[in-house]
UniProtKB/Swiss-Prot annotation:
Superkingdom field: Bacteria
Subunit structure: Tetramer of two alpha and two beta subunits.
HAMAP family cross-referenced by the UniProt entry: Gly_tRNA_synth_beta
Name of the protein this chain belongs to: Glycine--tRNA ligase beta subunit
Compartments where found: Cytoplasm
């Protein structure tokens, strides 16, 4: 089979950096999908992406389709002649050309023909065109007088098989083998002589590294080295690194300075200004303090680097001066004095203003504080003030600083440290893997705020549907569960949901407790799935409806401890045996008339069950409880070996059924292990 490497490069104006990887992945996926549809084989695929180009290299692409036997099934041989003639005509042949074949138990007319495989070079134009058009673009652009759309205007197109150009015209561009280097330095235009050497040629001729991940690691190493040169430690945010990588083709990292006077501004504000506006990396000294130095990555090798550094220093000086101004202006007004402004900020239609929300948070934070042992006064105070920073200049400019700046402003206002910390951390966890609030008061406010949002929005019928979650309630619910589980808070979730609903807006359906609880349980399922917990373990615990997510977690941990434990597997089988006996009976009790028992084995089981019940029913040491149940198994087995449950004596039968129902209740005190098949 003859093969050649196929190169596709689409040259564009600067692509949106935050979606460059997504575009590259879609570009590659769509192309390989179309090649697969054409049954064209290849050995491997490489994706390349820079700010000005998307490229794919398909190695050892089959140069011609294999010949195929095309077969069409027609009417049965007993069909009307006109139907058979019509089928033959649709195939472009006479009736006598059709063949008869048995399909199932019936004979049908079939038309078969051999279709010669087409040359790949003749298929690539339409294949590439479809691949490009199928890229999902939220905000497409039009340019020139062309009736085409793309994320940015396109300027050149390379399509090559080996060293040969594939003739094509796509989006008004004629294919060729000419690419472009950097805009302002080096070779501006040059040819790709061979598809497989694409990456090498661009690197040698224009110093452009087209592989995204390779370029990313180059930037990482350069940033680390620049930090070392400044006797500092670079803080590399992966999302910022991805964005910077999507902004440069020829990365050259350098450092610049800003006045140390700006260090009087909270460091989070300085870092946010450097990251969001300038795409700078910040540096810390050996003690972890922010240094008045930044690292930027240029897209050019300059003979006069000082000019670039000076320009960046002037820009960051202006940005940090703005942050300093916001900080000074905001401190002139207390958080409490801003409460009235929150009445003009809409939280959500039907749920009132932010002013309404903080009143609910204040009350609910105080309640939760009493339950978890936090300071009630500080928790309520933090709940009242936790949203005031939303109307400050700093948070208006840097939305990611909400909460953080509130903590600083609280300290400036003379609020105590517990209140300030709770305000600062009440949004946590903000994303997967984020830290939890560190203080009890912060936990109380975080729970109150998140529950108010989740119950309110779902309570007015605006909860997530399918893949749509416009208010990020799934993430918020997961954060709530993480707080309760990882902070070891034994809180009754249904009770909290009910209380939150009753304190919410009058538009909220207070009867949606079960719906919200089930929503939370689906998020808990996702939480354990991410942790690779056997889904049967989750279902076994869910079946006994623990009131507290933390208690739920303790049960899951206990069951996980006994995975692949033969003694536990035997216990599961015993439980299933009991469940099978009891499934045909209703209205059974766990109160046993022991005076009706006659056999030694059943009396022994009664005595052991009574003793075990006292030890485990109020215990949350579920690992120990399971160990006790495993030790209990021999007594249960002895009972089944020596005693007939379904005796003719009605009173005795009822006593025995109640006894094994009592035994089953001990199993259910941990989980419904009938869901397990470990």
């Amino acid at each position: 089979m003859n093969t050649k490497d196929f190169l596709l490069e689409l040259g564009c104006e600067e692509l949106p950096p935050k979606c460059l990887q997504q575009l590259s992945n879609a570009f590659t996926h769509n192309l390989t999908t179309e090649l697969d549809k054409l049954k064209l084989s290849y050995s491997s695929v490489e994706s390349f992406a820079t700010p000005r180009r998307l490229a794919v290299l398909v190695s050892n692409l089959q140069l011609q389709q294999n010949d195929q036997i095309i077969e069409r099934k027609g009417p049965s041989i007993s069909a009307f002649d006109q139907d058979i003639e019509g089928f033959a005509k649709s195939c472009g042949v006479a009736k006598n050309v059709l063949v008869q074949k048995t399909f199932g138990k019936t004979q049908y007319y079939f038309f078969t023909k051999q279709q010669k495989g087409l040359k790949t070079i003749d298929l690539l134009e339409s294949t590439v065109d479809i691949a490009i058009q199928n890229i999902s673009i939220i905000k497409p652009m039009r340019w020139s007088n062309l009736d085409t759309y793309f994320v940015r205007p396109t300027h050149w197109l390379i399509m090559m098989l080996g060293s040969d150009v594939v003739p094509a015209s796509i989006m008004g561009l004629a294919s060729g083998n000419t690419t472009r280097g950097l805009r302002f330095t080096g070779e501006r235009i040059f040819d790709i002589t061979c598809a497989k050497d694409y990456q090498k040629i661009l690197l040698e001729r224009a110093q452009i590294e087209v592989d995204f991940n390779t370029r990313k690691e180059i930037i990482r190493k350069q940033v680390i080295q620049v930090a070392k040169n400044n006797n500092a430690i670079a803080v590399i945010d992966e999302s910022l690194l991805d964005e910077v990588c999507a902004l440069v083709e020829y990365p050259r990292a350098f450092s610049g300075n800003f006045s140390s006077k700006f260090l009087d501004v909270p460091e989070e504000a300085l870092i946010s200004a450097m990251k969001s506006h300038q795409k700078y990396f910040h540096m810390l000294d050996v003690d972890g303090n922010l240094m008045p130095v930044f690292i930027s990555v240029a897209n050019i090798e300059s003979s006069n680097l000082s000019v670039i550094i000076d320009g960046n220093e002037r820009v960051i000086r202006s940005r940090l001066a703005d942050s300093e101004f916001f900080w000074t202006q905001d401190k002139a007004h207390t958080l409490e004095s801003r409460l009235d402004k929150l009445n003009q900020v809409l939280f959500m239609k039907s749920l009132g203003s932010m002013g309404d929300k903080i009143k609910r948070i204040e009350i609910f934070s105080g309640y939760i504080a009493t339950v978890i042992g936090a300071n009630v006064k500080d928790s309520a105070r933090a709940g009242l003030l936790c949203k005031s920073d939303l109307v400050t200049d700093m948070v208006g400019e840097f939305a990611d600083l909400q909460g953080v700046m509130g903590g600083y402003y609280a300290l400036n206002d003379g609020e105590n440290k517990a209140v300030a910390s709770a305000i600062s951390e009440h949004y946590h966890p903000r994303f997967s893997g984020d830290s939890l609030p560190n203080t009890s008061e912060g936990l109380a406010v975080a729970i109150a705020d998140k529950l108010d949002t989740v119950t309110g929005i779902i309570g007015i019928g605006q909860g997530p549907t399918g893949s749509k979650d416009p208010y990020a309630l799934r993430r918020m619910a997961l954060g709530l569960l993480r707080i309760m589980i990882e902070s070891k808070l034994n809180l009754n979730l249904k009770e909290l949901i009910s209380k939150s609903l009753n304190e919410n807006s009058s538009a909220v359906n207070i009867n949606s407790v079960d719906d919200i609880y089930q929503f939370m349980m689906r998020r808990l399922r996702a939480y354990y799935k991410e942790q690779k917990v056997n889904i049967q373990v989750f279902e076994a615990v869910l079946a006994v409806c623990p009131e507290s997510p933390y208690d739920f977690h303790l049960r899951v941990e206990a069951l996980n401890t006994f995975t692949n434990n033969q003694a536990f597997e035997n216990l599961i089988e015993t439980n299933k045996r009991i469940a099978n006996i009891l499934k045909n009976y209703s209205n059974l009790l766990i109160k046993v008339d022991d005076s009706a028992l006659v056999e030694v084995a059943e009396k022994a089981l009664f005595k052991a069950t009574k003793s075990l019940s006292k030890r485990i029913l109020n215990s949350t040491n579920y690992t120990k409880n399971i160990q006790e149940l495993i030790a209990f198994k021999d007594i249960i087995d002895e009972f089944f070996d020596k005693v007939m449950v379904n005796t003719d004596d009605v009173v005795l039968r009822q006593a025995r059924l109640n006894l094994i129902n009592w035994v089953r209740s001990l199993f259910l005190s941990v989980a419904d292990v009938s869901h397990l098949s470990l």
